[in-house]
UniProtKB/Swiss-Prot annotation:
Keyword Manganese part of the UniProt annotation: no
Underlying gene: divIB
Protein name as annotated: Cell division protein DivIB
Superkingdom to which the source organism belongs: Bacteria
Organism listed in the record: Lactococcus lactis subsp. lactis (strain IL1403)
Record-annotated membrane-spanning stretches: 132-152
Amino acid sequence: MSEKDNNLTPWQQKHLEYQKRKAEEAKKEKKANQPKKVHFSSPFLKSLPKTEKNFDDTRDEAESAELLEEGFETNNEETQSSEAPIENEKIIAQLEQLSQENEYEYEEEQIKRPSRFFSLFKGSAPLLKKMWPALAIVVLVFVGSLYLISPLSKISTFSVSGNANESSEQVALASGIQTSDSIFNILNNKEKIEATIEQKFPRISAVTINYHFPNRFEAIVKEHTNSVYVKRNDQTYLVLNNGYVITTPVDATKLEKLPVLQNFNDEEVKTFVNAYETLKPAIKSLMTNVTKTPTDATKDFIAIDMSDGNQVRVSLSQLADRLPYYPSVAKQVQAPQVVDMEAGIYTKPKAAYDAYLSQLSTSKSASISAQNAKKTDASSENTAQSTTTSSN
């Protein structure tokens, strides 16, 4: 048995043996149907006269015929034996092909064959189709009930991020959220919780509460930035970029590089901050000290000391409109200069401007004194006339 035969399955080997037996039976049947003797006519024999043929010649002819017949049969057997391996290989190839086809058909049958589970519901498709909506509702209610009574429906952690000045513990406490609260309750009151936190912490400008699966919440905090300082009664207070003044005094040794407003009330502080926050950082960084210098014409006139040595005088109500021109003006003058923006824009050396202000103040004081003297004289005359009239 060849190596290829050993690789056949038991069924293929039995089939091969059956094919071999059929081949041998066909061979025997073919041999049985053939004539036992084949007579060949020889040219040599034809050349001899028929009368000269004797018994010996007849015997020799018979023996020659038998030898030829045996040779013919031997050749046939050799031919059949040489063709046998070829036929076997063909049979093996056919068997392999047949086996592959059977396996393929078996796999297709297994795929097409419904499972036992689905066979249980055979014939109930119309009923299931009608009951499907009700079954879906029942399943959803069941799953929802399980979720509500499970720990997953309760908040597990609440974290705070983005806070620099307010502590996470204080923000969490102000939110009123506890670990035993329902997730749906927090989601329904999300905006209310955010507004509560913003109201309790003036430094916080916005709060966003985010939900993270499965039961975590995070409060993302955005704080107001520090804008300026305001000095009142020798105490310095921080002002946020929304104009809110922190009521706790700041240590004078720990001040940031921000402008300091001198004796501004809350309304004036908010007006200044609103305009200040619209300016470019390059201009804001130059401002150091701001004082109120009202005039008869401009009651909200202020003086802004700049770090380059100049001083800008402008009305508080026009700060956002006029101050952006300062950088171009500063390039054209040599400090220290006073840049007056009350009526138009003009510059004057600081010493000359201070002298002008001093002279203006003296003139104003003299005018006030003269007016007071006139009022005193008029009052004296009225008193004298009243005395004369009463004596008469």
